């Protein structure tokens, strides 16, 4: 297993690996495999690229192969959203409280805080930039910045209808 993502939550360190999710309890010096399943019996078994806790307390998990998972620690419920993409690369929450997910195929995806899909912002094939994958996300002052392909930068202005691409 290689570690690809980390998130701190109280005394716990959530660890995204090449084969699932683990939690390290620092107070007990103990590792646990995150074995929660969805109501359909699905558990996180593939590469975890990003783990983010949103303002409402839900934990969003981006995977390469199983899409997005959302864990509610209060209700102890895990849900999976793979309808829009199986290959989620990164997650960030904007200043508008919406959750943005980068996809290897579908561009920038936008969800409300509960996980309801709102809209996608695809990378235009007309730009002829080759690789259409959105690699990483970062929220800065009402803008969602992203790495696109191998030589491009994208910017989505919260509330707008398009993802602008800048060639580097």
Model regions and ranges:
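Carboxylate-rich, polar loop motifs that coordinate divalent cations or form catalytic acidic clusters
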Residues: 1-168
């Amino acid at each position: 297993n290689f570690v690809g993502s980390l998130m701190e939550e109280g005394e716990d360190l959530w660890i995204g690996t090449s084969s699932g999710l683990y939690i390290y309890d620092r107070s007990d010096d103990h590792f646990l495999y995150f074995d929660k399943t969805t109501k359909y019996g699905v558990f996180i078994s593939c590469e975890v690229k990003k783990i983010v806790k949103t303002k409402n307390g839900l934990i969003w998990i981006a995977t390469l192969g199983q899409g997005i998972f959302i864990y509610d620690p209060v209700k102890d419920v895990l849900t999976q959203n793979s309808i829009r993409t199986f290959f989620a690369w990164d997650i960030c929450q904007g200043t508008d409280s919406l959750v943005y997910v980068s996809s290897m195929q579908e561009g920038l995806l936008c969800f409300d805080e509960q996980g309801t899909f709102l809209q996608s912002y695809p990378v235009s094939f007309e730009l002829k930039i080759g690789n259409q994958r959105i690699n990483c996300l970062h929220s800065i002052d009402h803008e969602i910045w992203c790495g696109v392909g191998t030589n491009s930068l994208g910017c989505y202005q919260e509330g707008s209808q398009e993802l602008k691409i800048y060639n580097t």
